[in-house]
């Protein structure tokens, strides 16, 4: 069996794993509109050929450690009626399990395939600009094939580079004393890229976005996507704030919520968390915290 870990946004530009022979595909949907939240929670996914559906384990238990270093087990994946019967299912999935997947789904519906491709192109374009800026210095870029992430072997005075990064309020991922990794996303601005290039090379960068994907893209040309995706009607209808708001309202009208009745069964997340407790989750001090920040 071939198992492939992948990135949903990258797959808008790159061939999907199924087209290159993958049997099982895993990944996270976090970058589809879900804040980093200091590492979670995020909705992961595991997909396989329909012929393997009945061979998948009904439960996957993950082993971890608690704050005291003790072995701890948690339910990482469970198969429910809704995963098998889909729209024919008659039972519900707890909010805490479905909420993050719903958020990622709405993000995909709002942007649609064209919007997601635009976001992916913008992310890759800025990564290419960063690549060119670093390549022109004496640092060595480890990976010449990339979508949004560069691994860089630094040369020169590393302590000076760290100081420039600190002065610019930039944190990057340090693997060791001279090997770093930088990932770009849709929240990264051209100013951020310019500051990164200057901090790493001490060279100012100008005309950052005057760069075409046709000049030197980091994607393998043989791996570019040609097939369509997200062909269902709902991914092509709700691309304005008003349309999206009304669509979500129509869906919510089909459900039982605290604004119209008590919730006698299930949805423990909604029963136990008041609005005043849930509001801070959206604060940038919580939502925008990167899991690797010091």
Where are these regions (language model features)?
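Active-site C-terminal subdomain of aminotransferase-like
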Residues: 32-137, 142-144
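Conserved PLP phosphate-binding loop immediately N-terminal to the Schiff-base lysine helix
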Residues: 1-36
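Conserved PLP-binding catalytic core of the aspartate aminotransferase-like
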Residues: 124, 137-166, 184-187
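Flexible inter-domain linker/hinge segments
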Residues: 190-264, 268-276, 281-285
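Pre-Walker A segment
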Residues: 285-294
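Noncatalytic alpha-helical scaffolds and linker/capping helices
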Residues: 167, 175-199
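Conserved phosphate/anionic-ligand binding catalytic regions in large, soluble enzymes, centered on
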Residues: 34-47, 51-52, 96-100, 183, ...
